[in-house]
């Protein structure tokens, strides 16, 4: 914590120094412009000044009489290609540059920005729910946030709002559709996570519709959006308590999760044990030699100790796959040791032990064994325990070796290094394609995943934030040029091209998670990130503009068609939840095809609305 505070102070002092230098430079430029203006007044005659004033007023009248929307292209630096050159084919270079910026944003966010946020959460001792609702949401939605900031403070148009709305619909319909279509299995979904995020997300979209209905946003409306996200963080803080209340109301107080109280007789017994299997090769072939562990534990519930309950919790989908695998291995070892330490065994050739202490019976109908020191086929109990201990030690060594190998593989994963080309043709092509990006990031952003750079996570956070801002600026600039060249409004480019480009990495990550059977995580992440996009991605830049930069001002929306797009966004939430409910809370190909079809309908309707097909909502873009 002390290291975190010191690094924060260092970054604050650097930011203050840069701000002071920038203010001093702007003041000098203003003084220089005043001197140049005074010299021109002395040099130019009064008649010429009157002519200039007349021209200025006429030009202002012409500008006010224009029945078109000023393009956002003029807010960026001048392009090296003319509009005619771009129409002749130079726009392809801008498309390639925009796609490269999409890839660069994905690399910076996944390999540098998110790991630094994880380190910050560890130092601040934040719970998993709060960290996921704050820092992790900011990490996955950083491109959309910076695009919105650029849309408010630079382009002063609707590209930021269009990107947020388009990305939100993409996250709900397209990501769920792709996961259902290509997951390769039917994934079960739980109702709690989906309903929790969907309900609050619906409230957020309703608030957005109310605030942008008059095509302007005031300071208090933007502040309400930010405060709604603070309430969402509080809800995530007490998510476990709210979930328990939800479970009690839906399933009743008698049904507990994970089989902790499924059998009252076993809970009341002081000498209780479970039926377990010895994970060795059985001598018979009619039945499977190994029973599934989760089926076995659910079929024969027993009173859990503290360590056993902890292991059961840590094999759920709330933990990383590596942790779940390690805890599942420990559960198998514990069950095996308990079998060997049990007091009765069958005297058959099979090594499956079945014992229910409450009834004091065994499989062949006899009572408990009178010779507790003897095991299966007369083998001494001490010998069995010694053999089990040796096998347990060997399994522990194998598990440690596997964990070491996994850690080595994790260390190898990460961004490409510019001076270490990988093996393989495909990997070499990827390395050559990303070489300029990896070269720049290698010398400017420390990789806090490496042990020797772990203490520099705040520097990683600051430098990666600057690179995300720079890449987002380049991305919006290129997309604005593409839209101006092709005659496409900025809001359509935001809903389609920018939204898909910034959300494709999240789509790929959700697909990987869904293929592992964790569809809950994929769906909840896609909907939960939309809450951050709406409330912080739009609310925070609007609040900064109307409260800090220009107090009391309004955020003007150029396109009246955005209200229809946001209305479709609200409808997509209802349709998705209703479709999941009709599909019996399962994510499969049928649900995936339906979501992708609805996403296509949304794109068609939004594009036709912005082009004034149904009604007049948008002025045409001004030419050169």
UniProtKB/Swiss-Prot annotation:
What is the designated name of this protein?
Answer: Sodium/potassium/calcium exchanger 3
Q: Which family does it belong to?
A: Belongs to the Ca(2+):cation antiporter (CaCA) (TC 2.A.19) family. SLC24A subfamily.
Q: Which residues carry this modification: Phosphoserine?
A: 289
Membrane topology note = Multi-pass membrane protein
- Has the keyword Cell cycle been applied to this entry? no
Report the locations given in the UniProt record: Cell membrane
Range of residues in the leader sequence: 1-25
> Start-end of the Alpha- repeats?
130-170, 499-530
Could you tell me what reaction this enzyme catalyses?
Answer: Ca(2+)(out) + K(+)(out) + 4 Na(+)(in) = Ca(2+)(in) + K(+)(in) + 4 Na(+)(out)
One of its Pfam families is Na_Ca_ex
Keywords assigned: Antiport, Calcium, Calcium transport, Cell membrane, Glycoprotein, Ion transport, Membrane, Phosphoprotein, Potassium, Potassium transport, Repeat, Signal, Sodium, Sodium transport, Symport, Transmembrane, Transmembrane helix, Transport
